[in-house]
Every structure is written in C-alpha cells, then in structure tokens.
C-alpha cells in the first residue's frame, strides 16, 4: 500500500478508534501492520529533520502505534529468565531472529537488551542491557548503555552515547506532543533524564544527573540567556539551581532546579576533547 494510502487509512481508523478491536480485520489491520513494519525497518520514522534543522512529526505513525494496542490481544511472550514468560501485546523485535538476521541488521544486542517491535536500530549501534520502546529510532554507531531507556517514538542520532541509567522519555499521548530528539554526536550522562519533547541539538554534552523537561530552564552562565525545551548545539550542561522567590515572611524561597550551560565548544574541539575535560570547570 502506498504511503499516502497508508496515512489516509490510519487517520480514518484512528478517528473511529472506538470501533477498532482485536476482532478487526481487513484494510485497517493491514495498514497498521504495514506501518509498524516500515518503522521496524527504519524506512519511515516518527520524526525527521529538514535542511533548516526543523523537525517534523509524522502523527499518523504515532496513531498506527496506538491503534496496534487496540488490534492486538494480550499473549504469552517467551524468553524470560528461568523459563519465565511475559504477558503483553507487543512482541520483541528479535522474535524469530537467527544468526543471519542479526548479521544482516549489523548492530550488537547483548543479553538483557529489550527492543520492542517497530523500533529501529541502525548498523553499528550497541545495546547493553537496556530498553528500547516501540516506534523509537536509534541511528548508526550509537551506544545505549546499561539500564538506559529509550522511550516510545524517541529519535536518537548517530554516534550518540546514552550513559548508564539515563532515561530518554517517550511520547504516544497526548497525540500532539512531539518526541524527545537527541541529534548526532551527543553525550547523555549517567542517570540523566530528557523528557517531554525536549530537543538536544548536535554535539551537546549533558553531565551526569541533568534533568530536562519541557519547562526546565537552561541558563547560559556566560550570557544569561535562557533556553526552554531545546539544548543548543555543542553546549555543555551541568545540573544547577535558580534562586527562588522570597516567601511572604521575607525569608529566601526554595531554589528551583535548572540546567546550566558552562561552556560551548565547536565541532573540532568536541571531536578531540574527552568528555571529562569538557565538564571540568
């Protein structure tokens, strides 16, 4: 089915989603399956960047993922530790894969790595024991380290390092919300969290424990400029606080969390300098 027909069918089905059930067959089921297969192969993605740097979200693909939950019944998923099973609606990306299929895909998935069907993993990526949710896109030569999470529909660029325990938030609902986007050559420090549609631009570095949501203030300590929802290219961020407003009795109010841009580097410096050196004040 051509992409335009897929999009139209899925949009119409989503508008009438209350009528879509596990018993639904025919064109709607086929359209959703086709869309999930295209996502799984990386032939389409939930969001893509244009030449100007703007990201466009393909909402119809998010709708396809949401419709799949209505179309698919719960079932036993084998492969748990100690012979245990799971009970879910979404199969593993690796279901039925053998040596040839893994070699063709060209990425590394160590024991304990969980990837749900419709997520795409590009060549030379490395997945340590981690979780990649449905509809996500992980580009070439990216490392998803131990206990890191890539949320539903998140977009991860090339040569990104997502450190141990870091969380990249997912988004399926509300439908109008955009996914978290980590552009090429970024470093996300251990136990950091990027959520609520934040965009981390090319080459940025987040120190350990940086938390970014849609309303988190990102303060450039040199210029005083404040960013919200987007980390500038090649910015180096550490956790910080902003002074709170005085309370009614005149006492200092509680400080609020923010992220602080401690420096900015160019592409050449970023490529030649270790992360530890960049984060050293």
UniProtKB/Swiss-Prot annotation:
Keyword hit for Cell inner membrane: no
Protein keywords: Acyltransferase, Amino-acid biosynthesis, Cytoplasm, Diaminopimelate biosynthesis, Lysine biosynthesis, Repeat, Transferase
Primary localisation category: cytoplasm
Entry's Gene Ontology molecular function annotations: 2,3,4,5-tetrahydropyridine-2,6-dicarboxylate N-succinyltransferase activity; nucleotidyltransferase activity
Listed transmembrane segments: none
Residues engaged in binding substrate: 108, 145
A family per Pfam: THDPS_N_2
Catalytic activity: (S)-2,3,4,5-tetrahydrodipicolinate + succinyl-CoA + H2O = (S)-2-succinylamino-6-oxoheptanedioate + CoA
A GO BP entry: lysine biosynthetic process via diaminopimelate
Superkingdom of source: Bacteria
Subcellular localization, as worded in the UniProt entry: Cytoplasm
Pathway: Amino-acid biosynthesis; L-lysine biosynthesis via DAP pathway; LL-2,6-diaminopimelate from (S)-tetrahydrodipicolinate (succinylase route): step 1/3
EC number: 2.3.1.117
HAMAP family the UniProt entry points to: DapD
NCBIfam families associated with the record: dapD, PRK11830.1
Homology family: Belongs to the transferase hexapeptide repeat family.
The protein, known as: 2,3,4,5-tetrahydropyridine-2,6-dicarboxylate N-succinyltransferase
Name of the gene encoding the protein in the UniProt record: dapD
């Amino acid at each position: 089915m051509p992409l335009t027909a897929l999009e139209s069918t899925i949009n119409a089905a989503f508008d009438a989603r209350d009528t879509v059930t596990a018993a639904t067959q025919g064109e709607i089921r086929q359209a959703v399956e086709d869309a999930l297969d295209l996502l799984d192969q990386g032939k389409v993605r939930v969001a893509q960047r244009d030449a100007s740097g703007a990201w466009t979200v393909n909402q119809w693909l998010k709708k396809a993922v949401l419709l799949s939950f209505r179309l698919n019944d719960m079932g036993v998923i084998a492969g748990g530790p100690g012979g245990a099973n799971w009970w879910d609606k979404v199969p593993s990306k690796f279901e039925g894969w053998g040596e040839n299929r893994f070699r063709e895909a060209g990425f590394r998935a160590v024991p304990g790595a969980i990837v749900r069907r419709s997520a795409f993993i590009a060549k030379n990526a490395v997945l340590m024991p981690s979780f990649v949710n449905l509809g996500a896109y992980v580009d070439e030569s990216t490392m998803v380290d131990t206990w890191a999470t890539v949320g539903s529909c998140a977009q991860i660029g090339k040569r990104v390092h997502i450190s141990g325990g870091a969380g990249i938030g997912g988004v399926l609902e509300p439908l109008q919300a955009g996914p978290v986007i980590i552009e090429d050559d970024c470093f996300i420090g251990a136990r950091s969290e990027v959520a609520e549609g934040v965009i981390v631009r090319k080459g940025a570095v987040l120190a350990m424990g940086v938390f970014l949501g849609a309303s988190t203030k990102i303060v450039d300590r040199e210029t005083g400029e404040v960013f919200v929802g987007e980390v500038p290219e090649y910015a180096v961020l550490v956790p910080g606080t902003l002074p709170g407003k005085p309370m009614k009795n005149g006492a200092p109010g509680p400080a609020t969390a923010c992220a602080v841009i401690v420096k900015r580097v160019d592409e050449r410096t970023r490529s030649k300098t270790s992360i530890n050196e960049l984060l050293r004040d």
